[in-house]
Amino acid sequence: MKFFTLFLLPILLLSGEILTRTQAIMGTFVHITLPKENNKEISTSFEQLKGLEDVLSSYAPHLVYQLNQKHTVPYNPTLAYAITLSKDYYNDTNGYFDITIGSISKKLYHFGEENSSIPNNQALQKAQRNINSIEINNTSIVTKENITLDLGGMGKGYAVDRVVEHLSEQNISQGVIALSGDIRCLNLCTFGLQSPYSEKTFATLTSKIPQLSISTSGTYRRYVKDQTHHHLIDPKTAKQGKAFVSVSLFTHTDNTKIDAYATAVSVMPKAKALTFLKKHREIGFVLVLSDGKIVYGNLNAFVKMEAIRDLF
């Protein structure tokens, strides 16, 4: 499995000693920053994330991988809840978020694997997507034989939320949990958005609220051969989204939802994406269009935009 990172680590706005530790989990580099006296909880958080990876990852030998191979696995509450949420997000986004996109992203492109390749149009059009074909009962989780799941479009956000829930139970209210582009600032923080065209940042933002959830999705890190064959695929057309090269969303205490929404917005046509985001006033956004134009909105409740710089 290849590892990816999309985001710059936020800077905490607090006094006192802090500690940041990093591990490679869930196909990315995970950075956890907490007050130094909470070092033990950083270790606990990493172990929790490894447990979530064991369930949600579509790579061998994890549970979703087993489901994709055998099309039935014993009931697992973590996976069942993630699938249930995914069905809700499918409905919320009018089908632009669809975890059965795995029939294309995993079964045909093999994104993140050494044997990745570009499928032909005939194979793409034959690939089956049907989120309603996933069945959950008291003893098992079942998919149809022509369906492959990929929870990568919401899994990291889901993992961030589960870790933050645990830290909240330990009365920890300062720190940052960062899984690539899916981040939670427990208290106030300043962070940068990375240009899709270079390693520099094009915007600096400061959170206005504690428990800010951040999710960034981009076409420029995970692809096969060249960036036109990136991993953000419209489940309606089986083709790559073309309107945006970067989508960053912000909200309060819900990384799972904005991870899924960022995935969906990335593959929507421009007009539909802007209509969707303007309707969801509970979500702030910064978008980089394929022509390099930057569009943003609904930010005032969540972040202060300190600066916007040239993308190139």
Describe the residue ranges of each PLM region.
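Mature catalytic core of soluble alpha/beta enzymes
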Residues: F3-F4, L14-F312
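N-terminal signal peptide c-region/cleavage motif recognized by signal peptidases
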Residues: P10-I11
